[in-house]
Each structure stands twice: as structure tokens, then as C-alpha cells.
């Protein structure tokens, strides 16, 4: 008689799943953490809600209204969730039939699109970006049959560049009546002029992902948003958990989205952009750096000579970067979060000391 293990009882797609390798899961013992695109210092908040004996609202009214005002959309076009990652998953759960439909994304890009789909049992299709990391629209068009959700990250993680807005329009026309197009704008606060939020009236099948983890300096809060037309939001509300945001999370999110909170966020963005330009200029002068790519975000992608050795050398010194070497078209590339001036200097000094 054969023995059935617990693993044997699991779904086949889960047994075969490679989980997303988050910065924390990868570990490391560092003093300089530049691998997760977090804001380098903590922002202080005081809790004002003490009703922890009661369940929270599913969609806290103040949070929704504050975010709608900030994003320039209607409150009924906003859904709040446990980070933008939950929004990625909700869109698949609401629109994709297991074993029938597919999602499509364009590597190199954020890894949670594929993990979310594979966990649910939905097919993943990929159309790698062109050499300039813009969309291969012909390639996408050729693979759209059966695709229900298309994910496009702009600015793209990990490459840092914006997707051409005309290409977005072409994609939205290609998919009209066929699929939802999801613009992942996790880093849009660093280039707000490029947001597609103003396009919702034109495109009923457009959804936009946002987060408080980056420019709002609240990665530990786990609070994200989906912006979409009311019909899409209503469908997502059918599949979201009954209490996605705890009372303390909603409390802090509402404060972060107050007029004072928005001003503070924009000051942080200006500071990070100044620091980013300083770090880019310094990296371009370092012998072990082959190429530094332009960035519209709070991180920089660079190609290195002997990138694996450089990554390990800095890791051993307690400077933790993100290795992108295995991503399509990113051979030799490391991603560096823009931190404080002191952290930038640690990276610069360590890289200058590398023997090429």
C-alpha cells in the first residue's frame, strides 16, 4: 500500500510552483538594504482609532475618498487592498477561468503577475519587450487569443523606464472587448505626469494598480489600490476578502493621504530624485560598471562586469542589492534602490574598491 504524503495531496500547480523571491525571503545580513525599493527611513504616525474590538469596514470610506481625491478619480473607481499584490490576484480571480483563460505580461518585469496566475491555475503567456524595453505590440497581438488580463508595469520594475503612452493606447485598442489591461503604477509618484488615471473614462477595460509602499514610505503597512471603472470595481468586490484592511492600516493610510501627508510624500519624492541623479552620475564613473540605465523611479538598474562577483562582494560587506541577472535581457544587471546619501556613498565606495 503506497503512502500518500501531505505534498501529494496538494494541487499539482502548487507542487510545481516556484514562489516569488521577495527581498525579505532572499535574506541577507546587511546594514545597507537597497534591494526592495523601500524608502530609507521610517515615517512616524500615531494611531487615532481605538475600536479594535470591532471588525473594520471592507472599504474604509475616508481612505477611499482621500485616495480618489489624490488620484483625480471618483470614489466608486477605487478599491483598496492588502498591497497592490492583492489587486494583481483579484483581477485574475475575477476575470480568468481556471484551465481556460490566460494572462499576458512582458518580461523583464515584476514577478508577481506569473506567481499569482500560476497559484490560481491560470495560463501565463509572455511577450518579451523589445531591445529598448518597450512593448512588442505585434507579438502581443499574435498571442491575445484567450487572454483575459494583460499586465504592463510603467514605470517598469526592474528596468525603470516608462512605457510609451501611444503604445498603451494601441494596446488598449487591441484589447477592447477582449481583455482587461492592467497598468501597474507602483512607482508613478516619481513621474506623476505619466499616469493613465485620466484615461479611465475612455477605456472601460483599463485598470491601474497603485501602492503606498514606495513614495509614501509605507511598505510595512501593506496597502494598495486598484483604480478602474465602477463595473470592474464591483466585480473585484465580489472576490475580495470581507476585511482586507485592519483598523490600524486604514487609520495610517487615511493620515498618509491627508493634504499634509501628500505634501510630505512629494517632498520625499523630490529628495529621492535628487539622490538618484547623484548616484547615477557617480556610477557612470566607476570602472566595474558597464552601463547605467535611465530611471523614472526610486531605483537604478546598472550592468556590471562580473556582476555575480560584485553582488557577492557587496553582500559580504552588508550592502544588499537585487540581482537581476536571470531576468530576460538583463544579463549582468543589478538593481540598486536609491537610499540616503550615506547609503549611496557606501555603494559608491564599495564599487570603486572592486578589482576589475
UniProtKB/Swiss-Prot annotation:
InterPro entries: Aminotrans_II_pyridoxalP_BS (IPR001917), Aminotransferase_I/II_large (IPR004839), HisP_aminotrans (IPR005861), PyrdxlP-dep_Trfase (IPR015424), PyrdxlP-dep_Trfase_major (IPR015421), PyrdxlP-dep_Trfase_small (IPR015422). Keywords: Amino-acid biosynthesis, Aminotransferase, Histidine biosynthesis, Pyridoxal phosphate, Transferase. One of its GO terms (biological process) is L-histidine biosynthetic process. It comes from Escherichia coli O1:K1 / APEC. Pfam families: Aminotran_1_2 (PF00155). SUPFAM superfamilies: PLP-dependent transferases. It comes from the Bacteria. HAMAP family: HisC_aminotrans_2. PANTHER family: HISTIDINOL-PHOSPHATE AMINOTRANSFERASE, HISTIDINOL-PHOSPHATE AMINOTRANSFERASE-RELATED. Pathway: Amino-acid biosynthesis; L-histidine biosynthesis; L-histidine from 5-phospho-alpha-D-ribose 1-diphosphate: step 7/9. Its EC number is 2.6.1.9. Homodimer. Its cofactor is pyridoxal 5'-phosphate. This is Histidinol-phosphate aminotransferase. The gene is hisC. GO terms for molecular function: histidinol-phosphate transaminase activity; pyridoxal phosphate binding. Belongs to the class-II pyridoxal-phosphate-dependent aminotransferase family. Histidinol-phosphate aminotransferase subfamily. It catalyses: L-histidinol phosphate + 2-oxoglutarate = 3-(imidazol-4-yl)-2-oxopropyl phosphate + L-glutamate. The modification N6-(pyridoxal phosphate)lysine is found at residue 214. Transmembrane segments: none annotated.
